[in-house]
């Protein structure tokens, strides 16, 4: 994720006299030299965007070095990864019996450790590009390093889904706060509309949870696959439209919400029920409407960005064919696959 962050730090100044001849210019240069292109406080710093506050230049009195120091608050454009993030393009740089290593081609510099397993170890080849999901563990940003490190696995369709039980209405103020995420989804949908339709179909079908035959198609216009018939008694709700209605107090968020696997992964749809009849493996999660919508919207954003990145990365048939072994691994993990 790309974002703005504010940091506080203390800089050592070797030549206070020269530094103070043009404090702003020297300070900006010093910050860029120390932090840009490196890890710092759980982020990878891309650019210094401003100096918010600074102290005077103090002279060290604990020794006779003549050096100084300055306390600084500055803003920076940063990139950072979170647990369970999806990365569409990770290039395999090492694969042996003990470990698989990959480097992200799309995010800030990060080395990803893919724990060796019989299936993944026998499939992924050095030089190939694989889609990866980060594990439920911290991404490590060691200060001063020029790349982060993380663990993950080749991303395969998920069989499980969560059900959320909302017992309080979403307020207009909360709905307004969610419009930033809605705007991101709308921008990603606009970008998606410019992609090659054949590529979108290929990757949506690849990541559809159920195994389907070649003559079965996905209906990208209504964001459902052939297994959508199983829930035909329910009408899916467009989350984006729902939130626009919530701004006008024209919708109710009470009840049980879920995004079961019959919907396409990047679908902006969800199902809402008065009584829980979802066939989920876990008990419903009781939470506020705001928490539930933030969770759903971020999931939609992750999948939409993931699908767009897949289309951009594997942008020709030759490249797609060179990775048929990866696609086969993904297909074999689907519900209904004939082993």
Swiss-Prot record:
UniProt GO BP: viral transcription
Protein keywords: DNA-directed RNA polymerase, Early protein, Host cytoplasm, Transcription, Viral transcription, Virion
CC annotations in GO: DNA-directed RNA polymerase complex; host cell cytoplasm; virion component
Induction: Expressed in the early phase of the viral replicative cycle.
Lineage: superkingdom: Viruses
Subcellular location per the Swiss-Prot or TrEMBL entry: Host cytoplasm; Virion
Cited function: Component of the DNA-directed RNA polymerase (RNAP) that catalyzes the transcription in the cytoplasm of viral DNA into RNA using the four ribonucleoside triphosphates as substrates.
Subunit structure: Part of the viral DNA-directed RNA polymerase that consists of 8 polII-like subunits (RPB1, RPB2, RPB3, RPB5, RPB6, RPB7, RPB9, RPB10), a capping enzyme and a termination factor.
Protein family per UniProt: Belongs to the Asfivirus DNA-directed RNA polymerase RPB7 homolog family.
Free-text comment on this protein's domains from its UniProt entry: Contains an extended C-terminus, with no homology to characterized proteins.
Name used for this protein in its record: DNA-directed RNA polymerase RPB7 homolog
């Amino acid at each position: 994720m790309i974002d703005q962050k504010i940091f506080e730090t203390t800089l050592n100044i070797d030549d206070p006299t020269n530094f103070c001849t043009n404090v702003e210019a020297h300070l900006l240069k010093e910050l860029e030299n120390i932090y840009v292109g490196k890890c710092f406080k759980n982020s990878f710093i891309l650019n210094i965007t401003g100096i918010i506050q600074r102290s005077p230049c103090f002279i060290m009195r604990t020794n006779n070095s003549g050096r100084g120091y300055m306390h600084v608050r500055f803003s920076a454009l940063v990139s950072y990864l979170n647990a369970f993030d999806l990365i569409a393009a990770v290039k395999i740089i090492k694969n042996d019996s003990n470990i698989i290593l990959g480097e992200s081609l799309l995010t800030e510099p990060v080395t990803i450790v893919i724990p060796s397993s019989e299936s993944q170890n026998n499939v992924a080849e050095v030089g190939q590009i694989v889609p990866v999901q980060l594990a439920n563990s911290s991404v490590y940003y060691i200060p001063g390093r020029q790349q982060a490190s993380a663990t993950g696995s080749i991303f395969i369709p998920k069989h499980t889904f969560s059900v959320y039980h909302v017992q309080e209405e979403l307020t207009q103020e909360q709905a307004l706060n969610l419009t930033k995420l809605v705007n991101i989804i709308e921008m990603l949908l606009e970008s998606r509309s410019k992609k090659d339709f054949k590529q979108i179909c290929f990757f949506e079908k690849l990541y559809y949870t159920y195994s389907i035959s070649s003559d079965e198609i996905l209906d990208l216009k209504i964001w459902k696959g052939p297994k959508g018939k199983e829930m035909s008694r329910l009408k899916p709700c467009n989350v984006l439209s729902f939130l626009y209605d919530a701004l006008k107090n024209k919708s109710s968020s009470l009840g049980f919400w879920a995004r079961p696997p019959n919907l396409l992964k990047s679908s902006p749809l969800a199902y809402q029920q008065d009584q829980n009849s979802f066939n989920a493996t876990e008990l419903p999660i009781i939470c506020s409407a705001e928490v539930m919508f933030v969770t759903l919207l971020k999931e939609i954003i992750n999948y939409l960005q993931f699908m767009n990145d897949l289309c951009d990365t594997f942008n020709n048939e030759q490249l797609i064919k060179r990775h048929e072994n990866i696609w086969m691994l993904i297909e074999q993990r689907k519900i209904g696959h004939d082993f």
